[in-house]
């Protein structure tokens, strides 16, 4: 599940990724524009998976890869002109049960938005490249640990070829 915006608007009509609710997304547009004006880089999760039932997992499962791809094309086109975003796929859990859906979404965004970088955020003790490291759409590694940070970052930098790595979540 997911929360409405502060005005009570849900992101999608009828829990359908392919039916964006324009008032919700107009609010997102205003927030993104203001963040850009202030010089913020936004880490944008187009479909936050959630630590438990607080994310989009059920919605992605219901949609399946074809509808996730359609949503990815839509959101990628909508925000490709912005200069201040980094796409972050996943969020607080491993994507095993929605791996094909996450892949379809990410590849679709990349198809229409070649300028922005992509990373992913999985469960504690993992890095983005642990799941999709060999796929062309994943540009930047991110590490998530509540353990020793230096060890995790050094381990994650050992990939071939080496790619940039940053700490996305810790204590």
List each language-model region with its residue ranges.
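Short beta-strand/loop segments at the ligand-binding rim of alpha/beta enzyme cores
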Residues: 109-119, 160-171
């Amino acid at each position: 599940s997911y929360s409405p915006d502060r005005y009570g608007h849900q992101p999608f009509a009828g829990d359908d990724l392919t039916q964006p609710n324009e008032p919700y997304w107009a609010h997102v547009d205003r927030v993104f524009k203001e963040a850009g004006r202030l010089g913020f880089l936004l880490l944008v999760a187009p479909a936050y998976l959630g630590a438990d039932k607080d994310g989009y997992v059920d919605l992605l499962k219901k949609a399946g890869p074809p509808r996730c791809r359609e949503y990815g094309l839509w959101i990628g086109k909508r925000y490709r002109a912005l200069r201040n975003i980094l796409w972050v796929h996943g969020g607080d859990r491993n994507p095993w049960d929605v791996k094909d859906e996450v892949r379809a979404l990410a590849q679709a965004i990349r198809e229409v938005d070649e300028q922005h970088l992509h990373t992913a955020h999985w469960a504690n003790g993992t890095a983005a490249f642990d799941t999709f490291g060999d796929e062309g759409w994943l540009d930047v590694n991110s590490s998530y640990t509540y353990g020793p940070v230096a060890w995790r970052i050094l381990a994650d930098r050992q990939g071939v070829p080496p790619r940039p790595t940053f700490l996305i979540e810790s204590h």
